[in-house]
Amino acid sequence: MTEVQLTILHTGTVLVDQALPYHRDTDPPLAWTHLLRPKSALVEIPVSCYLIENSHGLTLIDTGWHTDNRTRWGQIKNLRHQYPTNKANLPEGQAIHEQLEEHGIRPQDLDLVLMSHLYCDHADGLRLIKEAPRILVSEPELRAAQKDRIRYLPSQWKGVNLQTYAWNSRVGERQAYDPYGDGSVMMVFAPGHSPGLAATLVRGTETVVGVKPGVIGDDLRKYILLTSNVGFGRPSFEERLRPGVVTDAKAAFSSLDWACAAGADPRCIAMYANHDPEVEAGTRSLV
């Protein structure tokens, strides 16, 4: 059996109001912006990227913060109107290209870069790995980013050959993109937080027999689920808390319910949310 390796890379942290990752009905309007809120409402959470190594080579999911954020002025210039809401912390050695270099990998060695979505803490590092041969995001996500200059910062992918993919498969009833044609890596349409958000299924080769299709469908292989920002951490899934920032609240709850069901499936060996402070960096293996 071929071993699949998933390496979780923490590319710094982001300081946000606790209402941004976890929306509660008791939150005041726009609480996620931290407007008129106490410092005690702030939380610092990791910003994650994922390196997948399988028979198809090296696949990177998301890119984290850019090194511009290492100075206060550089960060203000880079994040612009989003700076008051999202404050980046990127220690030396934690930018995506620096961590890849530690693993002996150059951006041009990557076979594929897949973006879960294009919000600032996920897309900011695109310029650091622009030499990668293929960088893809879902078509609805790029379309939204080209129109919405409040939620997105197109300067973050200036000079990057960012291309789109179309849904070409399904995971259960959800549309999905299968870049390699064998279901080993699947980008699953999970909108709500953003219009084109995609979670990621990383499959091994071991199977679970006798399992019902459920929300994942009839593929029997074990998998790791990367929820991206469908949920931010344990409270998301245990208390059914959608993100504070959404473009479609109903869709966000639907995607969250799907992730909960997918995470509870007997084929799922682990589920990781991008900003979960309980998830440690490092390499996981599945066969």
Regions found by a protein language model. Give the residues of each.
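Core dinuclear metal-dependent hydrolase active-site scaffold
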Residues: Q5-I8, L42, C49-E53, T59, ...
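Cap/insert and terminal regions of metallo-dependent hydrolase folds
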Residues: T67, Q82-E98, T205-V287
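Metallo-beta-lactamase
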Residues: M1-I105, D109-D121, L128, R134-F189, V209-V211, K222-N229, ...
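Active-site metal-binding loops of divalent metal-dependent hydrolases
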Residues: T11-T13, T63-H66, L118, E141, ...
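Metal-dependent catalytic neighborhoods of phosphoester/phosphodiester hydrolases
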Residues: D124-E131, G282-L286
